[in-house]
Amino acid sequence: MTSFLQIPAVSHYWLCNGRVPLTLLADQTRRWPLIEAFQQPGYREDLVALDIEVRDGKIADLQPIGTGNKADIPAVDVRSGLIWPCFVDMHTHLDKGHIWPRRANADGTFNGALEAVRKDSTQRWQAEDVYRRMEFGLKCSYAHGTQAVRTHLDANGAQGEISFEIFRQLRKAWAGKLQLQAACLVSLDYYMGPEGENLADLVASSTGVLGGVAYMNPELAQQIERVFELAKEKNLDLDLHTDESLDPNEITLRYVAEAAIRHQFTGRITCAHCCSLSVQSDDEVRKTVEAVKAAGVTVVSLPMCNLYLQDRQPGRTPRHRGVTILHELKAAGVKVAIASDNCRDPFFAYGDHDGLEVFTQSARIGHLDHPIADWPQAITSAPAEMMGLENMGQIGEGWGADLVVFKARSFNELMARGQGDRTIIRQGRQIDPTLPDYAELDDLM
């Protein structure tokens, strides 16, 4: 779809008559005037009407609409459209992406997904296959307005070498367009042997993040201890899959948090999914949340994938949404984010690497609305902070002019339509928003 705006191909211009969510402005000390029409009881959207000056790829100035000296400078009327910073997608699985046509999940269950991916990876994940599918996902992300992506890479045995080599190639190829990070993905028992240390060395040499899946088992405590030992020894951050289940007895998140406290771990720790919190007693939830807060663990929720997989039983309507307790975690002071997770693979049959879809679907699934409040941070500034990325995910003077401009004039309009005509600005320049054609991958299917 064609962008609804045309930005002049010059280094200096104004975006006029835009609306920026208050929570996405970098300077929260300034008294920004809110649009009164959106401050009515029962319909509150904290939006600021602004003109934004772009110069040499950066935001040079922010002024209330109709003010400031704009003489002899090209100006683009945004027509009251929303202006966001670019998205930050901190949890993806690019190496699994887009295999659905050749390896569907027959019953849509979590176990069905595991088995389908196991078969596909052992038979098909050679270098060219992985490269092309990962690059396809990056093309989608970039066209939709994403600025940074973290991907988890299945890393058992030789697959780790293949996928991390591809990741390094793509990180170099996409430098200046997308900031890429990679976390390895194995079950935590993998770290108990010499192959686990070899993997940690591979991750460190790739400037990556140490990752894995925590499953409840009699050796879980020892496995987590080993992961922390390796992370400290190799100076690596952690990004772990925890409690991707609706079994109330799963408390791997708590194990991780308690280990972080014991180790006085100073690196970043993110835990993903944390679904079982949604079905546990208040007392169990309190114990885990207190430990997570004390440890400084951050949580990324994957609402679209969790809604798809969790509580799925043939012939039975699901009773649970499968999403973690985002409101309660945030209220307790835990930093939370949302992300896209899998895309067109056995773990999630749909998706398009679109940060806006992640936000709108998450708002519907997790009731992140009425009011929207600061939830837009969950797909912008919060994941940027959790990934250790500076000057990303907010709009402010001196920040990069990496923006998504929507025709929608309010959050209500934004979430009611798909916004396929959005305008993407990177380093001050409008980019081509054309999405890659699925036919590009036909010969791999």
Stretch-by-stretch model annotation:
Residues 162-176, 190-298, 315-338:
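Histidine/acidic residue-rich metal-binding segments in metalloenzymes
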Residues 1-70, 411:
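N-terminal metal-binding scaffold of metallo-dependent hydrolase/deaminase domains
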Residues 237, 258-269, 309, 320-406:
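His/Asp/Glu-enriched, well-ordered alpha-helical/loop segment
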Residues 53, 83, 100-152, 158-173, ...:
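Alpha-helical scaffold segments that flank or form the walls of functional sites
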Residues 81-103, 245-246:
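Di-metal (Zn2+ and/or Mg2+/Mn2+) metal-binding site signature of metallo-dependent hydrolases
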Residues 40, 397-445:
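C-terminal cap of metal-dependent C-N hydrolases
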